[in-house]
């Protein structure tokens, strides 16, 4: 009797299933395949929804964030890549979890993620104060191990343009670009005119050290400055004397008989006869020009 009842109860679902046409079955299969593809195309999960479900359902936040999220470790702190362009700090293990991995109720706690990417951080020692630092303006741009605090206090770490460095320390382009190690610089817009080329700013301390490498000592650099100053003064004196000479020639035309705008015509005096050579000579009256010739 009971067997008959069970067969009668199970009959209606079979009848409903048999009522589906082939077109309906094909549409159901297509919808299932489309849903499966959408599930597979979902590459990054959203930890915000998981965090909200944790608050409502009470699940462990570590286990919720471990699904479909990447963890990055920066200086010992773990961050979760949200997939939206920023990082979320990974939640800390609850205080109720013991050292053996069991919570207060004695149940096994979810494991903590340990697949973080460790980013090595190198610390440098400041040459001024001796403190260790991981990031510095001078170290990042010029490779000089000085922290930002010491850089702000000392004027030696000011910047200098390439043109000023060449004029002050008598350096050439090869001393900047080809001599090893090459001097590092930062580029900035020219404040005088934005249409001009970008300025190259160097560390003043490194420029001073490079000048000592080129000239050997500060005394030699001073001598080179004096020698170039003497040459500059000599050039100015020669230029001045040339202008003064030209001015005298223009003012005192009676001394300089050269005339630029008129053609000189000779006026010869009487002829003189040379018996030994059998030649005649006559001299210009207005200038010392003389001419010797023979008469046929």
UniProtKB/Swiss-Prot annotation:
One of its GO terms (molecular function) is damaged DNA binding. Residues 1-10 have a biased composition (Polar residues). Strongly expressed in the central nervous system and muscles. CDD domains: DBD_XPA (cd21076). Pfam families: XPA_C, XPA_N. The keyword Ribosomal protein does not apply. Keywords: DNA damage, DNA repair, DNA-binding, Metal-binding, Nucleus, Zinc, Zinc-finger. Its main location: nucleus. It is found in: Nucleus. PROSITE patterns: XPA_1, XPA_2. A motif (Nuclear localization signal) lies at residues 26-47. The keyword Zinc-finger applies. GO terms for cellular component: nucleotide-excision repair factor 1 complex; nucleus. A zinc finger (unnamed) spans 126-150. Coiled coil: none annotated. Residues 1-39 are annotated as: Disordered. Residues 26-39 have a biased composition (Basic and acidic residues). Zn(2+) binds at residues 126, 129, 147, 150. InterPro entries: DNA-bd_dom_put_sf, XPA/RAD14, XPA_C, XPA_CS, XPA_sf, Znf_XPA_CS. GO terms for biological process: base-excision repair; nucleotide-excision repair; nucleotide-excision repair involved in interstrand cross-link repair; nucleotide-excision repair, DNA damage recognition; UV-damage excision repair. Belongs to the XPA family. Involved in DNA excision repair. Initiates repair by binding to damaged sites with various affinities, depending on the photoproduct and the transcriptional state of the region. This is DNA repair protein complementing XP-A cells homolog. It comes from Drosophila melanogaster. The gene is Xpac.
